[in-house]
Amino acid sequence: MAKVYLFLGNEEYLNKVKIERIIKESVADEYNINYYDMEEKNVSFAVEDAQTAPFLCEEKIVVLRHPKFLTTAKLEIEHDIKGFVKYLNNPSPYTIFIIDASNLKLDNRKEVVKVLLKVAIKEESESLSDVEFVGWVIRQFSQNNLKISQRAAQTFFK
């Protein structure tokens, strides 16, 4: 499993499902999964957590939400970007670091974005067409051992 993931695109729900799948496939237990909202906390808290050994477990997961410091947006919090870049260049071997940048347009001129795009596994979720959406709904039902007709699945987006 990779050590750094970056989730992009405007389908927040699909990104959430992919993130949950990574969490489920990891060996981290609920005490070693931490979420940080970058609109409320400095990225240094997440980096410090990522560098701390997991508690009675082999691995831990750190998830960043709303990392607007990767965009051109004006910020209320001054983030420790240098510390984050340093971490990205040498991620912890026992931490899966997930950045959920759903619905954000990254500023590719920033050093942190360049490093992130270089080191992270990038997952991008775009809006589904009506046909793709129906297929996706049917697959979700099937994965949960349930059945749904195509017509019934179409009612989800009417």
Task: Map each language-model feature to its residues.
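Conserved beta/loop motifs at nucleotide-recognition and modification sites
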Residues: 1-158
